[in-house]
Amino acid sequence: MTRNKHIWIFNAGNSYSGNPKWLFEYIRRHHPDIRTVWMCYHKDVRNYVKRLGYEACLFDSTAGKTIMKEAGVYVVEMCKEVFQPELAGITILNLWHGVGCKSIERKVTGGFLQERIAKKYIRNNRIYKNAQLFLVTSELMEKHFMEQCGIDEELLIRAGYPRCTVTDPVCTYPHDIRAIKGLSDDARIVVYAPTYRDY
């Protein structure tokens, strides 16, 4: 079956977020020739995306399986553990979810994630090596991801992350935290958001 390069499906795990969200929003606004569909594991995410006025499907639904068979591009931000059979032959655009100097993917040598990571590379290595394009933000990150994820240089795309470069206004949730919490305009807010570490 020939895949349609004008149908792109997107996923960011169990939410509508991250680099896939920002590229999804950008393509919807600037490339009407491309059909965009947000793929979901859970009904609450699907319903949320639909309330925004966008097309969304559950992976395990008839509509989801049909669109997975037709789509030409699958946009993600991680090395997925599961590739549904309907995705065979699709081009994967991995936007990753950030940069950092920690060991990831193939270079994880301990902790509870090690076994899961090893299993997914045994199961999906052919897909990662042959069907996945990988976004990197700099020459330094090229080296990092080639080493950490085993990606060949010809599959790298050097560009900025969509969430950092897309400047279109997006109205997916209210952003005025002070107003939501009933705080004054000069109230100071502190955020503590550590990255998970297993070492």
What are these regions (language model features)?
Residues 7-171:
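Active-site and donor-binding regions of nucleotide-sugar-utilizing enzymes
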Residues 196-197:
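Acidic, glycine-rich loop-and-beta core segments that form the ion-binding/anion-interacting portion
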Residues 1-5, 171-191:
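Nucleotide-sugar donor-binding and catalytic loop/hinge architecture
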